Amino acid sequence: MLKLNHKVKKRKKALETINELVNNASHLLLIHYSCESFYNVPSGYTPRVTSIAVRYYNTAQTKSFAIHKVAETQKIPFEDIEQNYDELEREMLKEFFQFVKKHKSYNWIHWNMRDLNYGFEAIENRYKVLGGRPNIIEDDKKYDLARLLIDIYGVGYFGHPRLEKLIEKNNISNRDFLDGQTEATAFANKEYVKLHMSTLKKVDVFHSILDKVASGSLKTNAKWYEPYGLSPQGVFEAIKDHWLYAVVMLVLGTILGKVI
């Protein structure tokens, strides 16, 4: 019973969170970034950042921070990016954290950006390594879309890789999208533009997924009972959350109102 109540409460809270975020669309951002492979750096070192994309939810305008763009601005030839990487990365992260400073009151939606390997802390630490002083986004402003989906639909709503399967199931365009392994290969091959295009695509995908969750139209492989369980209370909660329940209750209320 306690486990069921916990699952139901987590689902309800996650749905409320999504609705609150979408209702405050003017202060909602979606973020993703690409970086060096975790497995190709010396033990304990933070991976180099290649590009960051931040999208305004209410306008779909996207702000880009990319290593190749900084190189272009500084008139550094593409083939010389590698030997100037630290300086270019520092400038890119400086621009990003200037943006953060102006948007600290905003809510930030991300996908699994949770720790020092891959996350806000990793970007902050990388900037510190390069001699910068990052502006910190408070934890209560960060919302992990990956975790919210698990809370809403259950851990089995898709197997790994969940993001790719969500894209396929919901007929979302995957043009320019690279999976983790392909991104690692792209970094090794110095394909920075390809990496950035993938980063831009992923914030676009997050936007589509968030819209579908908010409208109740996201398709998953979750069975109707999985977020609740198969106990009598779980079945009741599942039925109660279905749109038909609201229709039936409205009709019954109308009939009873006329009778009474």
Q: Could you describe each region identified by the protein language model?
A:
Residues 2-121:
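Conserved non-catalytic scaffold segment of RNase H-like nuclease domains
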Residues 6-23, 89, 192-199, 220-228, ...:
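Charged, low-complexity, helix-prone segments enriched in Lys/Glu/Asp/Gln
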Residues 50, 61-67, 74, 106-196, ...:
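Metal-dependent phosphoesterase core characteristic of DEDDh/y 3'-5' exonuclease domains
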Residues 66, 79, 144-145, 179, ...:
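Short, solvent-exposed coil/turn linker segments
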Residues 101-102, 129, 215, 259:
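Secondary-structure boundary motif
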Residues 201-238:
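Juxtamembrane amphipathic/hinge helix adjacent to a transmembrane helix
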Residues 227-260:
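C-terminal single-pass membrane-anchor helix
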